[in-house]
Amino acid sequence: PGRVDIDLRPAIVEAKARVGDWELDTIVGPMGLRGALVSMVDRCSKLVRLSLVPSRQATLVADAIATRLGEHPERVLTLTMDNGLEFARHRNFGAALGADTYFAKPYQSWQRGLNEHSNGLVRQYFPKATDFSTVTAEDVRRVELLLNSRPRAALGYFTPLEVFHGTSAKPSVALAS
């Protein structure tokens, strides 16, 4: 209930012209194993935030999103996710962050293409066979730092950290204030 279709997002979100528009997903291990990663990617800076959760239960996922993105609430404007049950509490974390929430159409993962690409980068460190119940928060932070410190061609060879924190700006980037 209360899901807003991705087609209703403001045009500026599609333009990737400002920091603060996030794509959300979860990364899981093999069937039957507990634990998951919540992945959050800023569309403009490509900054990745990862949070380890013991399961994809909606309450745990909502708390993880509110906590990690709540570190910089001024840089959270919109949240776009798939229709997974783990995002059932979107109203809660959207309200906690003061952000509008949007949902991709079912079976159209390309509508959150940056997030899917970023999940592939995360999989370089945590392959599909990973049992996330054995992964530590320190492991997750290390991978997050590696990804966010990697210069990107799409960012003029600046890093996601540099663009997100405004120490350098990709051309025509507007930082959320």
Per-region residue spans from a language model:
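C-terminal domain-tail junction helix/linker
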Residues: 125-177
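Coil-to-beta-strand transition motifs
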Residues: 33-35, 43-48
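Active-site beta-loop-alpha junctions of metal-dependent nucleic acid enzymes
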Residues: 28-33, 50-74
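Mobile genetic element proteins and their domesticated derivatives, centered on retroelements
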Residues: 25, 40, 46, 65, ...
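RNase H-like two-metal-ion nuclease catalytic core shared by retroviral integrases
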Residues: 81-83, 88-94, 102-124, 133-145
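Mobile-element integrase/transposase regions
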Residues: 1-37
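Short small-residue beta-strand/loop micro-motif enriched in glycine and branched aliphatics
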Residues: 46-51, 103, 128
